């Protein structure tokens, strides 16, 4: 037994004995910490008897390989792995802890901020492998915010009063291409709104509702750096960051301006494709409207040539302007200015014809007097509609005419008038029509 051999040596030979033991080669794959308790106690007793006053020399780097070493050292724990995210996606200690926040090693674990942000942000995919912050960290999320995202707490209020809209706020996706930045920044702005930071987002005039705090600026910088890697940023974003790498607010302001410009472009295209003109508005106003739209689109990189513009304009013409589609649609070299010359000519002709017409109205009393003084020179023909009517049904004018003619001079006309109405009446007209009572 080696332990008995160690007890027989003198104190002076303890060093050589230890050297012989440590220099002995042990061909084994046994864990250096897997040593039985009995062997460990025997070694400790032998070492104490051999040298009770001399301190034990620390083991060398080769000692953990010896299973008989008396004082095992704790094994070093390897640093935790960072999951599927590469090392370059992590922020440094100085970047992640600028204002006293605890260091976080995983990009999905956004720091629990003083203004009650969500304690954990989950990236897309399985979430069971990612640890969560304990429930004791920070203040519990007790008072939810409005769902609208447009009403935000004032920065002058206490930090504890600012709570997150949801317990877990969905983070924006990772930016993977410079072409996807316009769509990505929309989701990032929505992420800030859900995190009670809508008040720091620039408005239409380029100014935020309230002043951003230092902690909020740090959070803005950290989240932008995590979810928008620098290699996928557009050139204009890199130019801003090259001047000031923390000026995320300027990037958001420029992005909002570009969104408004894109919206204006879409509206201009829709307006140009749905033009309508019939002369109800001045031709000058119509021309100004169309030319301004074409100029804005050309300035924004959407070029509208004369052929396309003329086709869109002529398609919306109606009324007297409609014939312009057929008179000049074959002219390939026609410009917008030439088309508007024709439109102006038709409009001026319409205005001239309207001005030449009398614009006065006759007095109603004059019309009444004219109707009274009007005399009918033609003698209307009398046609019996009902043969069963008696002579009393004749008009007063006919009876007066019969009386006057019978008193003055008798003639054959009187006999024709006194004839029965049941006889057919012959009309003196060119068609020689006859009306019979039984056929009427």
UniProtKB/Swiss-Prot annotation:
GO cellular component: cytoplasm
Residue numbers spanned by region RNA-binding: 299-401
GO MF terms, alphabetically ordered: RNA binding
Compartments reported by the entry: Cytoplasm
Site (Cleavage): residue numbering on this chain: 401-402
Composition skew (Basic and acidic residues), residue ranges: 429-440
GO biological process terms held by the UniProt record: viral translational frameshifting
Keyword Protease appears in the UniProt entry: no
Cell membrane is among the record's keywords: no
Matching InterPro entries: TYA
Annotated stretches, region: Disordered: 1-93, 126-173, 352-440
Composition bias type Polar residues, residue spans: 1-23, 48-60, 127-152, 419-428
Keywords: Cytoplasm, Phosphoprotein, RNA-binding, Transposable element
Residues that bear Phosphoserine: 416
Composition bias type Low complexity, residue spans: 153-165, 402-418
Other remarks on this protein: Retrotransposons are mobile genetic entities that are able to replicate via an RNA intermediate and a reverse transcription step. In contrast to retroviruses, retrotransposons are non-infectious, lack an envelope and remain intracellular. Ty1 retrotransposons belong to the copia elements (pseudoviridae).
Domain notes: The C-terminal RNA-binding region of CA is sufficient for all its nucleocapsid-like chaperone activities.
Quaternary structure annotation from Swiss-Prot or TrEMBL: Homotrimer.
Function: Capsid protein (CA) is the structural component of the virus-like particle (VLP), forming the shell that encapsulates the retrotransposons dimeric RNA genome. The particles are assembled from trimer-clustered units and there are holes in the capsid shells that allow for the diffusion of macromolecules. CA also has nucleocapsid-like chaperone activity, promoting primer tRNA(i)-Met annealing to the multipartite primer-binding site (PBS), dimerization of Ty1 RNA and initiation of reverse transcription.
The protein, known as: Transposon TyH3 Gag polyprotein
Organism whose genome encodes this protein: Saccharomyces cerevisiae
Higher taxonomy: Eukaryota, Fungi, Dikarya, Ascomycota, Saccharomycotina
């Amino acid at each position: 037994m080696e332990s008995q051999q160690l007890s027989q040596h003198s104190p002076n030979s303890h060093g050589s004995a230890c050297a012989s033991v440590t220099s002995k080669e042990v061909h084994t794959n046994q864990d250096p910490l897997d040593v039985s308790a009995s062997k460990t106690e025997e070694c400790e007793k032998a070492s104490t008897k051999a040298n009770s006053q001399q301190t034990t020399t620390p083991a060398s780097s080769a000692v953990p390989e010896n299973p008989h070493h008396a004082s095992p050292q704790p094994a070093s724990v390897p640093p935790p792995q960072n999951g599927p995210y590469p090392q370059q996606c992590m922020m440094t200690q100085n970047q992640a802890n600028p204002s006293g926040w605890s260091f976080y090693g995983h990009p999905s674990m956004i720091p629990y901020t003083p203004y009650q942000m969500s304690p954990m942000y989950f990236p897309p995919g399985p979430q069971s492998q990612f640890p969560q912050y304990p429930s004791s960290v920070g203040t519990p999320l007790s008072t939810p915010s409005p769902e609208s995202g447009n009403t935000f707490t004032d920065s002058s209020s206490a930090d504890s009063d600012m709570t997150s809209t949801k317990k877990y706020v969905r983070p924006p996706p990772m930016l993977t291409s410079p072409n996807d930045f316009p769509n990505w920044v929309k989701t990032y702005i929505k992420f800030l709104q859900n995190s009670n930071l809508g008040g720091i987002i620039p408005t239409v005039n380029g100014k935020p509702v309230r002043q951003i705090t230092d902690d909020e600026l740090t959070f803005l910088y950290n989240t932008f750096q995590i979810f928008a890697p620098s290699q996928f940023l557009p050139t204009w974003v890199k130019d801003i960051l090259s001047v000031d790498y923390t000026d995320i607010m300027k990037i958001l302001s420029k992005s909002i301006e570009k969104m408004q410009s894109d919206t204006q472009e879409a509206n201009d295209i829709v307006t140009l494709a749905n033009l309508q003109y019939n002369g109800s508005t001045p031709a000058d106003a119509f021309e100004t409207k169309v030319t301004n739209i074409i100029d804005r689109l050309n300035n924004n990189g959407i070029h509208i040539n004369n052929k396309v513009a003329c086709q869109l304009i002529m398609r919306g013409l109606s009324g007297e302007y409609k014939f312009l589609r057929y008179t000049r649609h074959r002219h390939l070299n026609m410009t917008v200015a030439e088309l508007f010359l024709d439109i102006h000519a038709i409009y001026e002709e319409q205005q001239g014809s309207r001005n030449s017409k009398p614009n006065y109205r006759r007095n109603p009393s004059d019309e009444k007097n004219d109707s009274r003084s009007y005399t009918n020179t033609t003698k209307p023909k009398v046609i019996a509609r009902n043969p069963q009517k008696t002579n009393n049904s004749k008009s007063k004018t006919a009876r007066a005419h019969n009386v006057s003619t019978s008193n003055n001079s008798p003639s054959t006309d009187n006999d024709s008038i006194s004839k029965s109405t049941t006889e057919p009446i012959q009309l003196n007209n060119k068609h020689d029509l006859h009306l019979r009572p039984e056929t009427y």
